[in-house]
Amino acid sequence: VLNKEVIEYLGRIDWRFANDKPNMFQRPFTDVIAGTQAKDFGMYHTSLEDMHGTKGDPYLNTFGKWVFHLTAEKSKHAMVAPRRMYWNFYTPNAGPDWHCDEDTFGHCVSILYNLHTNDGGTEFETGEKVHSKEGQALVFPSHLIHRGFAPTEFYHRFNLNMIVHLKNYKNPNDK
């Protein structure tokens, strides 16, 4: 019931088109959407990002912290706090690209929480594919190369992607 409430809420917020490539490699948006075979990378909404001071949406952040605490209790990782919360939205037209969430090797993990069951999911560079199952939280090192894959039978896929500090995290901006 709570996941459905969050999806209803996500239907009323502002979204941005995602681009999984670093700025220097991004194509102009007009190129991304041009032609009959064009695919976007999906959409996202940021509700928390500590590196840019984004505190965002209290409702979404409260839900995200609930997911964080439940996941941290069951995880073998010594999780401290969420660093970033991205909410992803994919349609069948999305073609997300390979990326890593954070390249701080061993200092952060990603939590990918599925808000509903659908035929989209997450694919890792190793070839492993995990389909979206409601209530499932995937935990993996944030430096692993992965991508989302869009649903084909369902028209939408919603999930929460968090980057989480581990106890051994060292902020690269601290001297």
Residue ranges and their predicted role:
Residues 1-78:
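Non-heme Fe(II)/2-oxoglutarate
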Residues 50-175:
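Catalytic core of non-heme Fe(II) oxygenases with the double-stranded beta-helix
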